[in-house]
Amino acid sequence: MKKLTEEQILENLGKFYGYITKYIPTGDRQDKLLEFYKGIEVTLAISPASTKLSHHNCFAGGYVDHVNRVVEASLVLDKVWERFGQKKTYTIEELVFSAINHDLGKMGTNEEPFYLPNDSDWHREKQGAYFKINTNMTHMRVADRSLYYLQQANIPVTENEFLAIKLHDGLYEEANKPYYITYSSDVELKCNLPYILHQADLMASRVETQI
């Protein structure tokens, strides 16, 4: 299992906060985001991005490392879509906000983290499952919990951000089909942000299994 040094974890955390202060304008929303993440900073800093070695970033600090990569990939893909003539109906703030918070549902609190170290030798050795989900937490889909946490923290979310976060898993999530497969231009997604965030997340996750 990959291991980050304490210095690398802190560097990634600083980069994460840097995206908030750079791309979310100074004011109430930035303040609330920083306050929220500072309140769960221990869990934020050391959480993995997944439970198994065969999945992406299954190591302490993997969550923030993944989110940072998704932010970077989103900014690059935004330029790619522009290069090919997209009709842009979202802002860079919306793009970065969605990327920062797309997997927020994988967080818990400092007292009740979503991911816990797996205490089963069999699961670690046979399945590479070094972490497990905290079953004390109410079951929700990751995207739903992400939006729930933002609501609980009174952090405003635009329509574009809501849909990007909700749909970031693309067609890997069965519940997203009615949004992506519509058979009618009248009800198709009116913004490219969900597609861009999904592509960024997919690319980051794939690359993370190879580095």
Task: Describe each PLM feature range.
Residues 1-125:
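Acidic/His-rich, divalent-metal-binding segments that scaffold phosphate/diphosphate chemistry
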